[in-house]
Amino acid sequence: MATNPMHQFNVYRIGPEIKLGEIDISFTNAGLFMAVSSIAILLIFNFGSKKNSLIPNKIQLLAELSYSFISKMISDTAGSKAKPYFSFIFSLFMFVLFCNMFGMIPYSFTVTSHIIVTFVLAAFIFIGVTIIGFIKNGFGYLKLFVPSGVPMVLLPLIVIIEVISYLSRPISLSVRLFANMMAGHTMMKVFGGFVVSLGIIGGWLPLSFTVALTGLEILVAFLQAYVFAILTCIYLNDALNLHH
């Protein structure tokens, strides 16, 4: 791991090998950190909502701020019709955020640095939003691909572009998160090794750069969770509030 910056992304088995036919379903480090992230979320918000005192403690304050933040994001992006989906958006944001943050711990594993994880999340969102769109609007949901005010001569081309854009949503959503997390952690590993090499000559400048880069990566971890959640809200808004 010290010499290969890509080694940190390796998935390895924890415990005995378990197979279902030809499919390996063994418990891995990826499964471990997804479970740890989920348990951490449950514990924090369970303790944060247990007392519900007038003067909140730090955990309760964190829970209340998180609730208000996501609630406002949904209202501003998808409107009041999206309120029934608050629990899903909230859980999605927190899961991605905690997976990103746990990946910042040395010798841990960044779940969201693997395209299969981010693509499954994005595909689930894409399928769910599409189903909601047809349930709410029937075949009128297809109006999403027919922008108003487009000249008839350009309409076939615009419809094709809109359909391709719609079908590429899970790809763009998953690749954005995966690429940013993998690139950020790779850069941190490479730069960290560079700082260790410079340690023989001393100096605070390389260490300061490492601290600054770590702070930047923490910010990126939050922003990527936010972008993932807000794009989900935008897609949900298209399904609930057709404006074409």
Predicted regions and their residues:
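Selective transmembrane helix interface/packing segments
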Residues: 1-244
